[in-house]
């Protein structure tokens, strides 16, 4: 019985230490703090520490180290959704079929690239997308 208790204690200690290590890995990454944890904490109205703890509990070590790459993908994906809403692409393409899906995808991609890769102001990149949509809609 004593051996079983020792094994359980060792397992608990391992889990605690593992969580602490993951928390430290995540806390020390300035990019993740600024671009992932702080925005999520604000959106959910919880403490940043709580967000980090959630990530540490839900992810394994490999995923903690890969989080930067996932964050970049998420940034582009979420921005693409925002562009869809701001330009009405979901209405024009998905529901009314006034613009082909491929054309809507290209417009979305160009706006996202202009903003993220070429550092254009979002409103300026959006205006370029808006002009592309108007041109497509007026084509006969």
UniProtKB/Swiss-Prot annotation:
Source organism, top-level taxon: Archaea
InterPro entries documented for this protein: EhaM-like_sf (IPR036606), NiFe-hyd_3_EhaM (IPR012056)
SUPFAM superfamilies in the cross-refs: Hypothetical protein MTH393 (SSF101332)
Protein name in the entry: Uncharacterized protein MJ0517
Organism classification: Archaea, Methanobacteriati, Methanobacteriota, Methanomada group, Methanococci
């Amino acid at each position: 019985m004593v051996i079983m208790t020792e094994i359980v204690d060792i397992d608990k200690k391992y889990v605690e230490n593992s969580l602490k290590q993951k928390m430290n890995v995540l806390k020390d990454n300035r990019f993740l703090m600024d671009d992932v944890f702080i925005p999520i904490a604000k959106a959910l109205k919880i403490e940043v520490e709580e967000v980090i703890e959630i990530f540490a509990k839900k992810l394994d070590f490999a995923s903690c180290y890969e989080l930067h790459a996932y964050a970049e993908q998420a940034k582009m994906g979420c921005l693409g959704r925002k562009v869809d809403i701001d330009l009405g692409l979901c209405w024009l393409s998905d529901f009314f079929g006034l613009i082909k899906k491929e054309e809507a995808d290209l417009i979305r991609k160009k706006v996202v690239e202009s903003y993220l890769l070429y550092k254009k102001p979002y409103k300026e990149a959006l205006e370029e997308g808006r002009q592309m949509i108007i041109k497509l809609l007026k084509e006969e």
